[in-house]
Amino acid sequence: MSVLGKTLQEKVNLLAQYPQTGLSLKQLVYFGKNPTPGTLFRAGLFLRDELPIRLARRIQDLQNLSPMLRSMKRISSVKAAYGRSMEEIIELKGVELPKCLPKHARYHNAPKWRSSLMDSEILHNPSLANTHLDSSKGRYFETDFSDQDNGVDCNWPESLLKFNSNFAYLLNTIRTRHDNVAVEIALDIQEYRRKTNQIDNSIQIFLDRFYMSRIGIRMLLGQYIALVSEPPRENYVGVISTRANIYQIIEGAAENAKYICRLAYGLFEAPEIQIICDPSLEMMYVESHLNHAVFEILKNSLRATVEFHGVDSDFFPPIKVIVAKGQEDITIKISDEGGGISRRNIPLVWSYMFTTASPTLTDDPHDIVSANSTTPMAGFGFGLPLARLYTRYFGGDLELISMEGYGTDVYIHLNRLCESAEPLQ
């Protein structure tokens, strides 16, 4: 039996049919660089439209898992959490638009799925048939952002300001509710593997899609909450840094990784990490995403180096981080002499749950999937697949080349053009 209930399940089935709308880093920055109550209202309407669609698709993915997986306690809890969040957004009411907005900004105040949803609900509740919808005028919010209300002389009504703050509060509640979602999925997948001793390709595809969607949802939530509720910061648009210093991010990730290495192996000094990078190199990026990927790779390189050469070794070869700036990409190459990976195991490094390390428990389960984590993940097998998803989210990539018996090179590609939309499925 569905944990959602019949009515909510029908809403999921309806909303999941609508296409998702992917945004690029450039769009997010352009729209949020000079926020006004009007632009934030437009962003809120977009999220009120988009988030239920994304949540509905993930609910369906969870429901399409094998009977054993979809009946597990944590996965059922995730379905319920997503369903609750979706319904809370659906039930959020719009406001009357200010008349001072220019003609191009008179977008719909109701989501594009609202009329279809109402038609579905009327079948079960005829009393809704006379409900007035405010979606008959103008056009809906678009992601072309070229028409903004910056500079419009308008006394924004209190109802609009209240919508912005209330919606930010709701999204923050949803973000907190979903904090444990990814780790709950991971733990049930882990339990499933223990019981069946297998992770087939369909589960791999599901996890890639689920975690990529989670990155996107949390990105949209965090960006809107930051724009509405947090004081502006220099060189930031919401959570996006317009001048992310690549050297400083790598340096911070390196220090954290070395600290973890010293703790894990009881070393006085961890292997050296040499950074060859222009200290002034900057780009527009989400710093936590890059930090997550670099930290994960460096942590793996440090572990491989220490274990290959022995904890009691008098000398560890340095790990080298080389950064190159191209016309389209900034590429970060991380090279170690940690013994490499066998050719047979290369395809498996992208598989969730595959690891060459013994399990290391953490105090906080969030650390398994957190973009801000500096806690050991060795033994869970999520590190490399998640790091690759973070780099791919805005059009980059992560590649690995290994020489068994010597070491491994990992390439992190960052898209400088910032025009790639989210890879939604």
From Swiss-Prot:
Disulfide bonds: none
PANTHER family per record: [PYRUVATE DEHYDROGENASE (ACETYL-TRANSFERRING)] KINASE, MITOCHONDRIAL, PYRUVATE DEHYDROGENASE KINASE
All residue ranges annotated as the Histidine kinase domain in the record: 180-418
SMART domains documented for this protein: HATPase_c (SM00387)
Physiological role: Inhibits the mitochondrial pyruvate dehydrogenase complex by phosphorylation of the E1 alpha subunit, thus contributing to the regulation of glucose metabolism.
Positions annotated to bind ATP: 296-303, 336, 355-356, 379-384
Organism of this sequence: Schizosaccharomyces pombe (strain 972 / ATCC 24843) (Fission yeast)
GO cellular component entries: mitochondrial matrix; mitochondrion
Entry keywords, A to Z: ATP-binding, Kinase, Mitochondrion, Nucleotide-binding, Phosphoprotein, Transferase, Transit peptide
Protein name: [Pyruvate dehydrogenase (acetyl-transferring)] kinase, mitochondrial
InterPro entries, A to Z: AK/P_DHK_N_sf, BCDHK/PDK_N, BCKD/PDK, HATPase_C_sf, His_kinase_dom, Sig_transdc_His_kin-like_C
Molecular function terms from GO: ATP binding; ATP hydrolysis activity; pyruvate dehydrogenase (acetyl-transferring) kinase activity
Stretches of the chain forming a coiled coil according to its record: none
CDD domains attached to this UniProt entry: HATPase_PDK-like
Gene3D superfamilies tied to this protein: Alpha-ketoacid/pyruvate dehydrogenase kinase, N-terminal domain, Histidine kinase-like ATPase, C-terminal domain
Catalytic activity: L-seryl-[pyruvate dehydrogenase E1 alpha subunit] + ATP = O-phospho-L-seryl-[pyruvate dehydrogenase E1 alpha subunit] + ADP + H(+)
SUPFAM superfamilies for this protein: alpha-ketoacid dehydrogenase kinase, N-terminal domain, ATPase domain of HSP90 chaperone/DNA topoisomerase II/histidine kinase
Pfam families assigned to the protein according to its UniProt record, in alphabetical order: BCDHK_Adom3, HATPase_c
EC number(s) per entry: 2.7.11.2
GO biological process, one term: aerobic respiration
Record localization: Mitochondrion matrix
Family classification: Belongs to the PDK/BCKDK protein kinase family.
Modified residues (Phosphohistidine): H178
